[in-house]
């Protein structure tokens, strides 16, 4: 029996008190800064705005490389266009924007679609090194982060939401000897994620088969996915962002709640 493996369903959540106590006032529902996109890929980052609002966040600001303005225009005052490289991704001068907007946000969502070039990596590295607020990474922002030093990659304000392929790379980077394969059993995955989260500071969220699995500081929760269409990690990550922004001191409970609300809202 594993006392640190907690199980829930949509009908029987682990943390009713948190689910019923969500802020109803937008002013109390948190502010998130979204950073992502490049001139060749930015739709997911722009679409994050509505998904985060639907998940329950109070305010969203999205930072994009400046050339994207020529494509979409100023469709919202919450879209901010930052200095870019010639190839249309964030450059080193973007750091001032990153830091300025982080100061008024409760956390950062690195949404992905970040060009895998050295200048973008350096500016993201400098941002992460200066920020103690929650940072949620998904999609190819995880791949970019794998180039960081271990002391930046492995911090207690870092939350990774991704598939098992990305987690295997993360485990390898942080010198875990456990292997993750696509056909791993649920019980083995729980064991591996529990061990990893005991030894490391980060929190993890993934979907495997019919379950959302959350791991943080040695605790693991599994949430049964009640419908096939809810195997949607893109929707899930936005609920993770919302819950972490609103409950930064109780990451495990917050992320476990996100596994409920992304299926019901």
Predicted regions and their residues:
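Glycine-rich phosphate/dinucleotide-binding loop and adjoining beta-alpha-beta core of small-molecule
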Residues: 5-6, 63-223
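Conserved post-catalytic alpha-helical subdomain immediately downstream of the catalytic base
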Residues: 229, 233-265
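N-terminal low-complexity/intrinsically disordered extensions
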Residues: 3-11, 186-190, 250-264
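Short glycine/threonine-rich catalytic loop with a Thr-x-Gly-x-Asp
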Residues: 21-24, 41, 219-244
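Positively charged, low-complexity intrinsically disordered leader regions
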Residues: 1-26
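Glycine-rich phosphate/diphosphate-binding loops and the adjacent beta-loop-alpha structural elements
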Residues: 34, 111-114, 176, 180, ...
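Short glycine/serine/threonine-rich phosphate/pyrophosphate-binding segments
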Residues: 40-54, 117-120, 144-145, 233-237
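Substrate-binding N-lobe of the ribokinase-like
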Residues: 18-82, 260
């Amino acid at each position: 029996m594993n006392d640190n493996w907690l199980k829930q369903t949509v009908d029987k959540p682990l943390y009713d008190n948190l689910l019923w106590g969500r802020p109803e006032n937008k002013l109390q529902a948190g502010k998130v800064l979204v950073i992502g996109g490049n001139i060749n890929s930015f739709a997911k980052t722009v679409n994050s705005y509505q998904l985060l609002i639907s998940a329950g966040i109070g305010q969203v600001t999205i930072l994009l490389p400046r050339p994207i303005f020529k494509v979409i225009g100023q469709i919202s005052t919450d879209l901010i266009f930052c200095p870019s490289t010639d190839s249309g991704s964030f450059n080193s001068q973007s750091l001032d924007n990153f830091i300025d907007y982080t100061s008024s946000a409760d956390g950062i969502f690195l949404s992905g679609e970040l060009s895998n070039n050295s200048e973008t990596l350096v500016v993201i590295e400098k941002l992460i090194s200066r920020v103690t607020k929650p940072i949620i990474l998904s999609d190819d922002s995880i791949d970019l982060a794998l180039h960081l030093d271990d002391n930046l990659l492995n911090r207690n304000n870092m939350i990774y939401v991704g598939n098992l392929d990305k987690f295997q790379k993360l485990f390898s980077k942080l010198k875990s000897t456990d292997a993750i394969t696509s056909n791993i059993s649920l019980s083995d995955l729980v064991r591996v994620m529990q061990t990893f989260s005991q030894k490391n500071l980060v929190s993890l969220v993934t979907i495997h088969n019919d379950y959302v699995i959350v791991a943080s500081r040695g605790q693991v929760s599994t949430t049964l996915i009640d419908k096939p269409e809810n195997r949607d990690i893109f929707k899930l990550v936005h609920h993770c962002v919302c819950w972490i922004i609103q409950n930064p001191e109780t990451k495990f409970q917050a992320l476990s709640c996100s596994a409920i609300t992304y299926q019901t809202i």
